[in-house]
Every structure is written in structure tokens, then in C-alpha cells.
């Protein structure tokens, strides 16, 4: 039986979505620079005839695959939005208006109004920042190694909080809020380790991304912010940072179970619906 798959070729990761023999939605993931591994996997799936591809590296991957498969290309955000709406339905959410923050290598932020979407903005701070700073500061360069170390890290000896500045005096804002990411590293002899550094890097990224998302949500009076992206996958520390900051500003954070695969899911759905 001929089959179709969806591929989201991102700056760091390439995600694949397909239906297995039992018609269950299934995912594969590769580093985008491991194109040989991607092609080897595809060759083993002998039933694949059509690929819908999206993402920043879609053109590059398409050139390698076009002789062997029928290729359908889809705009990156259209694919992501189709995937997000599918997951929202599967997880029983009934939300039509929201801010969508996609934390990939960098971060992009969109307003969603029913079936319309507008790009609000973005930042170069994202998953690539986490990995780049992790490599520079600790020489750890694999995401799978960063996550468990982050879980046991603490930011108290590296970040300056509002409470640190006011020193017990009543402050105008919450004492636990960060006044300066990594600020203590330059001012005092701190007792910190690699886990603490990694936790603080994630704190910096999480707070920057959340602050931008909150500004956009407040501007449009939107209550819900959906955070997606592979950077959040199994990354409870980052999710907690984003969640607490979002709730502090009276907005509702939502993390979708397969949010990191939204683009690949959307590409798959686009191709299968078009085919049918």
C-alpha cells in the first residue's frame, strides 16, 4: 500500500510524521545535518511514495529526494498551524484565539484569530541559544545531556533577583523575579557547577521568550499562549519557567503533548487531505 509522510526540516532537527501499520500517528527525529541517516531511514520505508515537506531546510532536503518521491511543499507556518489545530482537537481544547510561540532554533510568535494568523514577531533567542551557550560555558553540546543536568541545577548563585537588590526591603514587584540573568557571576565569588550554569541558561531563554509572548498577548488582549517546539520536549525545567512567568502575568500557558511535531503533522495532514 502506497503511503505519504510529512517532514518538517528545521534548522536543527528534522521531524517526520507518518501513520504506521496500525494507522497510529508516529514520529521520527533526526539532526538536520544528518541527511544520510534521514535518507537511509526513508529507503527502508519501501511503501513511501509521496512526501509533504516544510521547514527552513525544506528546499535543501527536497533536492536530495525529488528523484525518488513525489514532493509537495508547504509553507512552514501553515503546516505548523494545521498541526497545532489537530493536536488541540485531539487534546480536547476549544480555543480559537491565541498567541502561538514556536521555540525552535530561534523563536517565532504569531497571533491566531480563528482561521487567520499574523506574525507578531520573534527573537534569535531559542533552542539554538541554549545549545550554543551550553557548549561555550560547559562544553556540553548534546540536548539529551543538557536536560538531565538542568533538572538538578540551581540559578540562585548566578541570577540576581529583585529580592537580592532590595535586600529585605519591601520591593514594588515580586522578590523572586529575575533582575539580571547571570548577574552574580560578574559581581561575587559564586559556588556553581555545570548543572547550575545550564539551569541559568534555560532561565534566560525561557524568560526572554515568555516576556515577548506576554507583550504580544497583552497588546491584543489574548488570554491563552500556546508554547510549542522541540526545545520543550521532555524539558520540564524550561516548561516550568515559562509556565510560572506566564501565570504570574495572568495569562494561561498551554503546552501541547506533540507540539514539537506540529509542522510534520501539518505537512502529513495537508498531503493526505489533498490526496483524498
Curated annotation (Swiss-Prot):
Its EC number is 2.7.1.33. GO terms for cellular component: cytosol. The active site is at residue 76. InterPro entries: ATPase_NBD, Type_II_PanK, Type_II_PanK_bac. Keywords: ATP-binding, Coenzyme A biosynthesis, Cytoplasm, Kinase, Nucleotide-binding, Transferase. It is found in: Cytoplasm. It catalyses: (R)-pantothenate + ATP = (R)-4'-phosphopantothenate + ADP + H(+). Pathway: Cofactor biosynthesis; coenzyme A biosynthesis; CoA from (R)-pantothenate: step 1/5. ATP binds at residues 8-15, 105, 127-131, 143, 230. GO terms for molecular function: ATP binding; pantothenate kinase activity. GO terms for biological process: coenzyme A biosynthetic process. The keyword Transit peptide does not apply. Homodimer. Catalyzes the phosphorylation of pantothenate (Pan), the first step in CoA biosynthesis. Belongs to the type II pantothenate kinase family. This is Type II pantothenate kinase. It comes from Bacillus thuringiensis subsp. konkukian (strain 97-27). The gene is coaW.
Amino acid at each position: 500500500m502506497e503511503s505519504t509522510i510529512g517532514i518538517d526540516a528545521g534548522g536543527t532537527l528534522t521531524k517526520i510524521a507518518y501513520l504506521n501499520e496500525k494507522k497510529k500517528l508516529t514520529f521520527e527525529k533526526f539532526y538536520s545535518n544528518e541527511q544520510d541517516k534521514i535518507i537511509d531511514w526513508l529507503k527502508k520505508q519501501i511503501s513511501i511514495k509521496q512526501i509533504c515537506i516544510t521547514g527552513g531546510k525544506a528546499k535543501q532536503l527536497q533536492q536530495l529526494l525529488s528523484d525518488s518521491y513525489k514532493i509537495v511543499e508547504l509553507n512552514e507556518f501553515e503546516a505548523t498551524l494545521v498541526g497545532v489545530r489537530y493536536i488541540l482537537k485531539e487534546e480536547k481544547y476549544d480555543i480559537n484565539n491565541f498567541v502561538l510561540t514556536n521555540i525552535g532554533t530561534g523563536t517565532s510568535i504569531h497571533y491566531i484569530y480563528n482561521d487567520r494568523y499574523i506574525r507578531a514577531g520573534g527573537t534569535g533567542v531559542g533552542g539554538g541559544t541554549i545549545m550554543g551557550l551550553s557548549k561555550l560555558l560547559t562544553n556540553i553540546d548534546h540536548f539529551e545531556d543538557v536536560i538531565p543536568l538542568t533538572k538538578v541545577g540551581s540559578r540562585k548563585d548566578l541570577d540576581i533577583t529583585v529580592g537580592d537588590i532590595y535586600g529585605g526591603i519591601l520591593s514594588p514587584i515580586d522578590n523572586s523575579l529575575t533582575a539580571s540573568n547571570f548577574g552574580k557571576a560578574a559581581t561575587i565569588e559564586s559556588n556553581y557547577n555545570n548543572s547550575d550554569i545550564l539551569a541559568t541558561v534555560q532561565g534566560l531563554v525561557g524568560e526572554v521568550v515568555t516576556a515577548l509572548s506576554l507583550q504580544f498577548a497583552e497588546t491584543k488582549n489574548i488570554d491563552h499562549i500556546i508554547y510549542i517546539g522541540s526545545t520543550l520536549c521532555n524539558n520540564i525545567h524550561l516548561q516550568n519557567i515559562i509556565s510560572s512567568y506566564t501565570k504570574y502575568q495572568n495569562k494561561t500557558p498551554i503546552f501541547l503533548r506533540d507540539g514539537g511535531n506540529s509542522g510534520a503533522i501539518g505537512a502529513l495532514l495537508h498531503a493526505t487531505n489533498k490526496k483524498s
